[in-house]
Amino acid sequence: GNPLDGETRSFMESRFGQDFSDIRVHHDQPAAEAASLIKAQAFTTGRDIYFGRGQLQPQTTAGQKLLAHELTHVVQQGNG
């Protein structure tokens, strides 16, 4: 996976009060297939967030909400 881009990371860190430097996002074909298998737009395991096809769109309001939702899982799982 790849780290969050700098602008997105800064935006989310300021709202969560968390360091997301080691979060990895996956939005390739295997990630899309895994999300599809569990009928999810995205899912989180540990500090890795997997996105369905076309779901990683942090430049949009809907994309920010989805990413924030997944980052909440990171924090809730004690990985934040």
Report residues per predicted region:
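Juxtamembrane/interface and other helix-to-disorder boundary residues
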Residues: 1-80
